[in-house]
Regions:
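Short, surface-exposed alpha-helical segments at coil->helix boundaries
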Residues: 38-41, 157, 193, 252, ...
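Residues that form or flank phosphate/diphosphate-binding pockets in enzymes
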Residues: 12, 36, 61, 186, ...
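C-terminal substrate-binding subdomain of Rossmann-fold SDR/epimerase-dehydratase oxidoreductases
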Residues: 19-22, 55, 178, 199-321
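Hydrophobic alpha-helix immediately C-terminal to the catalytic Tyr-X-X-X-Lys motif of short-chain
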Residues: 155, 159, 163, 195, ...
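A glycine/serine/threonine-rich, flexible loop-to-helix segment
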Residues: 129-131, 186-194, 282
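Short, solvent-exposed loop/turn segments at secondary-structure boundaries
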Residues: 87-88, 183-187, 280-283
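The catalytic Tyr-centered alpha-helix of NAD(P)H-dependent dehydrogenases
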Residues: 144-152, 176, 184, 188-192, ...
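N-terminal Rossmann-like NAD(P)+-binding domain of SDR-like oxidoreductases, especially those catalyzing
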Residues: 1-179, 313
């Protein structure tokens, strides 16, 4: 089996590539290294079964050649992180929507099974918790850049589902909820690596807003395992599937737990959203997934707790000091 992973040099993508190699696949990685790195792939690159092509998925001819060579496609290439979305909205929209359209066209041309990684952000301001795949989505106004990412990902979902309806292209859409683990960068606003690095360096642990917003964090190994199973599951075709962990914690309690596990003396400092992201920033108070569909389709159940995640991230970040 030869598998194409767009965005395969990124945090989630590289973990998926490692799993695919372990199960015997040959892997093509298509990544422009805008957020991914060579380092994420170096420990598994034997020069034969994994090949990295440094190019943007918006390059239609290169992408088409990669899709044609592969037997199936995981599409992870995307702008990521709140900070990048706020700072570079044009890049966010063009890379997400244009890239997905390019990959889907080639998948349809060669009839390659396609898995899209979407995001829990598409639930927007929805208040029904836990979020189920068939729930309504509630977006904020277009004047607030924060919603450009969610809206672009929602358009990706519509496009993938349109290919399923019109051409029966085998597609699966996954909505990922706060995936975390070693090698994740804090550069683009990822909360756990940011907290851990601040704590280990004795810097203030900066919590945005009042800290009472809550999230659920899933280990990247659990998430990558679910992706690998879903693309190979016929019953998942044409469906949207939540992937994450349904154990909820407030961001303030997360900061306290990081401080405790690192043995840090850092203070916890509240930073207004406006100071962090500019005037008029919107956020979701709670984001909790229903995992019933994933469990039904592939027996998905997160196996690693938040403390497991934090322990792994802390151990990794200590090696970087």
């Amino acid at each position: 089996m030869k598998t194409l992973v767009t965005g395969g040099a990124g945090f989630i993508g590289s973990t998926l590539c490692r799993m695919l190699l372990e199960q015997g696949d040959d892997v093509i990685v298509l990544d422009d290294l805008s957020t991914g790195t060579y380092e994420n792939l170096e420990d598994m690159d034997d020069g034969r079964r994994l090949r990295l092509i440094v190019e943007n998925v918006n390059n239609a001819s290169i992408t088409d050649a990669c899709v044609r060579e592969a037997d199936r496609v995981f599409h992870l290439a995307s702008a990521v992180g709140v900070r990048l979305i706020i700072d570079q909205p044009v890049r966010t929209l063009e890379s997400i929507v244009g890239g997905t359209e390019t990959v889907l066209k080639s998948c349809a041309r060669y009839r390659r099974p396609f898995l899209l990684t979407s995001t829990s952000e598409v639930y927007g301001k929805g208040s029904k918790v836990p979020f189920s795949e068939e729930d309504d989505t509630v977006m904020g106004p277009t004047s607030k850049r924060r919603w450009s990412y969610a809206s672009a990902k929602m358009l990706d979902e519509f496009l993938a589902l349109a290919y399923w309806v019109e051409t029966r292209l085998p597609i699966v859409i996954t909505r990922l909820f706060n995936t975390v683990g070693p090698r994740q960068t804090g550069q683009y606003g990822m909360v756990i690596p940011s907290f851990v690095r601040q704590a280990l360096r004795g810097q203030p642990i900066t919590v945005y807003g009042d800290g009472q917003q809550s999230r659920c964090f899933a280990h990247v190994q659990d998430v990558a395992g679910a992706l690998a199973k879903l693309i190979a599951t016929p019953a998942a075709r044409g469906k949207v599937v939540n992937i994450g962990n349904d154990s909820e914690i407030t961001i303030m309690d997360l900061a306290r737990r990081v401080k405790e596990l690192t043995g840090s003396n850092s203070e916890i400092q509240l930073i207004p959203y406006e100071q962090a992201y500019g005037e008029g920033f919107d956020d979701m108070r709670r984001r909790v997934p229903s995992l019933k569909r994933a469990a039904s389709l592939v027996g998905y159940k997160p196996t690693r707790s938040l403390d497991d995640i934090l322990t792994d991230v802390i151990a990794y970040e200590r090696t970087k000091l």
